[in-house]
Amino acid sequence: MSSDRTSVVVSKRDAGGFEYPFAASCHPGREVTEQRTLAWVRRLRLVPDGRSLSRLKATNFSHLAAWLLPSASTQTLQLASDFTAVLFLLDDAYDEGQLSTDPESVEWLNEKYLGELFGYTEADMSDPLTRGMLDVRERIRRSHPHFFLNRWLSHFQYYYEANLWEANNRKQMRVPHLEEYLMMRRYSGAVYTYCDLLELLLERPLPLEVVQHPLIQTVRDICNDILCWTNDYFSLGKELTNGETHNLIVVLRNECVSTLEEAIDRLKDMHDRRVAEYQGVKEKVLALWADDEIRLYLDAVEAMIAGNQRWALEAGRYSGLESLIVRAG
């Protein structure tokens, strides 16, 4: 698959964030992609009014897609941007308001959305989120092998199930245990769906014997952990303000009876160990497969890891974290 070259590269060390042995890049088409996604959102009537559209735009969803997939073709970047917009709308629906603490309603909604995505039930096209999700699904179905669509849908399913787990916890006012949280965070972040989208940068999606190999699975797990843990770090201020307990720092503070600052330090240590582990796994992968496609996939994983942090810093989610530590630690 052809790709557009990136035009923006940032240093390997972003002030205030985490260090990586690889640099972040941004797709040069992000502004055009954003305008096309906003037009798509309006055309499908995914939001009710201009205020909601402005709120969606403020999330910098297209910039996230551009930082995660800097070498994508224009078509793949547009798909990722549109999917990210729908995912952010889903996050708002599940995490805010009465639904966030109503597991019975979440379970009903999950059955509805998953039934529609997998084609088990007739789609309710009056639901804007249904319209958005099915549009993304159909574009994948038309352009890529069915086995890839099923892989992506299976990982998307985990996201819905994790939302039910979170709603149950909120209703019970329960902070999850560390090991449980580490497992479920991989699903609540929907990162596996983006690991799948990275395969669209290759000539063909990875075959089963490759994608299910323990080494490649470890690569994807590490990528998932790093993205989710750094997101927990950057969104800590907002989530503490909202009383959200599904955050690794909050879980660490609760499990270890530590201060907030100590929990942050532990997250950073866990993060750095995962980065070091990735470097070792990467060497094993390249020793096993002398394949340009595998190397391209690893390059894409690294770009996504570094790009996720760059987007978070660009979006301003880091501001005020130090003062928050002083207040809450």
Swiss-Prot record:
GO MF annotation terms: metal ion binding; terpene synthase activity
Entry binding sites for Mg(2+) 3: N231, S235, E239
Biochemical pathway: Secondary metabolite biosynthesis; terpenoid biosynthesis
Pfam families cross-referenced by the UniProt entry: Terpene_syn_C_2
Record SUPFAM superfamilies: Terpenoid synthases
Residues that hold Mg(2+) 2 according to the record: E96
Motif (DDXXD motif): 91-95
Cofactor: Mg(2+)
Binding site for Mg(2+) 1: D91, E96
Keywords: Lyase, Magnesium, Metal-binding
Catalytic activity annotation: (2E,6E)-farnesyl diphosphate = (+)-eremophilene + diphosphate
Top-rank EC class of the record's enzyme: lyase
EC number: 4.2.3.164
Keyword Lyase: yes
Comment block on domains: The Asp-Asp-Xaa-Xaa-Asp (DDXXD) motif is important for the catalytic activity, presumably through binding to Mg(2+).
Family as reported in the entry's similarity comment: Belongs to the terpene synthase family.
Protein name: (+)-eremophilene synthase
Lineage: Bacteria, Pseudomonadati, Myxococcota, Polyangia, Polyangiales
